[in-house]
Amino acid sequence: MELREEAWSPGPLDSEDQQMASHENPVDILIMDDDDVPSWPPTKLSPPQSAPPPGPPPRPRPPAPYICTECGKSFSHWSKLTRHQRTHTGERPNACTDCGKTFSQSSHLVQHRRIHTGEKPYACSECGKRFSWSSNLMQHQRIHTGEKPYTCPDCGRSFTQSKSLAKHRRSHSGLKPFVCPRCGRGFSQPKSLARHLRLHPELSGPGVAAKVLAASVRRAKAPEEATAADGEIAIPVGDGEGIIVVGPPGDGAAAAAALAGVGTRATGTRSRRAPAPKPYVCMECGKGFGHGAGLLAHQRAQHGDGLGVAVGEEPAHICVECGEGFVQGAALRRHKKIHAVGAPSVCSSCGQSFYRAGGEDDGEDQSAGARCAECRGGEAR
């Protein structure tokens, strides 16, 4: 049998062989795109996102069938309308049984009664100090938190109380709303005017000074209610009782006569009883009181006591000479004058208090008592 050697020739390729033959490098068939690689194990398909279920429909506002005939404001209850109408009529049916002060709402009377009862239901969680009103507690808590929400738009300085910001802004505006009716000099603070009134003898009396200071404070708060004509200074006195007319600055006689009650013109047709005198004036805010006890209670509640120490408040300013503590820096500065010039002495002749100059008491007979310079000068003459 004869064997023939035949040359090999490639035959027809199947689909898999054709795929391998189409690549230059057979390894390329093992490299697949990331999109073609199936994930394993297969992930579970999440259901299509659906919109959240709608919430309950908003509750309709109750009807407000009670309408105020003065301003058109509507209310849902008759009691609310009645309470609102008192703002137009001025009715104050709720009277305090202790002092007779009246209020338009019973809730205001409840708050006022705490002045007489001494009730302090609001306590600070940090230091335990108690207050009669929640607003005072909120202001006190800013001491612990350091919050100062009232910021000056001119310099950026912040304050814990709005009244402190209003007092500070006068330094930028140069406004001096507290005017002396004797000489026309203006002051930015009522206590500065109170000190200035001592320079005018006709205005330094207790009753007259209190009237001038209180009228100046009211005029500064509501300047549109006061009128000025022909160079006169018109100062309102009381609630619509009249206007004290003081002549141009420098007219001391007219000022004294007007402040004494001479030359006042009434603005109302109905005569009213003259207000009780308030000779005790607070040097911090200008508020007047009929009794010294009322002034003392006011100073302790609003400005601290006479030495600047508030009840239950930790003093932050300590005197290095004697160790006495003060809450306010101004009180400490006033106290340091005692160490600088000594304690005030009382004149044995006229009873006035005065400070001795350095070395003044060396040549004076202590047994005869201390005397002021005016009394000693009168004897010399």
Swiss-Prot record:
It comes from the Eukaryota. The modification Phosphothreonine is found at residue 117. The keyword GTP-binding does not apply. The keyword Metal-binding applies. PROSITE patterns: ZINC_FINGER_C2H2_1, ZINC_FINGER_C2H2_2. A zinc finger (C2H2-type) spans 66-88, 94-116, 122-144, 150-172, 178-200, 280-303, 317-339. Signal peptide: none annotated. Keywords: DNA-binding, Isopeptide bond, Metal-binding, Nucleus, Phosphoprotein, Repeat, Transcription, Transcription regulation, Ubl conjugation, Zinc, Zinc-finger. Residues 39-65 have a biased composition (Pro residues). GO terms for cellular component: nucleus. It holds the Pfam family zf-C2H2_6. There is a cross-link at residues 191, 211 (Glycyl lysine isopeptide (Lys-Gly) (interchain with G-Cter in SUMO2)). Residues 1-65 are annotated as: Disordered. It is found in: Nucleus. GO terms for molecular function: sequence-specific double-stranded DNA binding; zinc ion binding. The modification Phosphotyrosine is found at residue 122. The modification Phosphoserine is found at residue 132. Coiled coil: none annotated. PANTHER family: ZINC FINGER AND SCAN DOMAIN-CONTAINING, ZINC FINGER PROTEIN 397. May be involved in transcriptional regulation. Belongs to the krueppel C2H2-type zinc-finger protein family. This is Zinc finger protein 787.
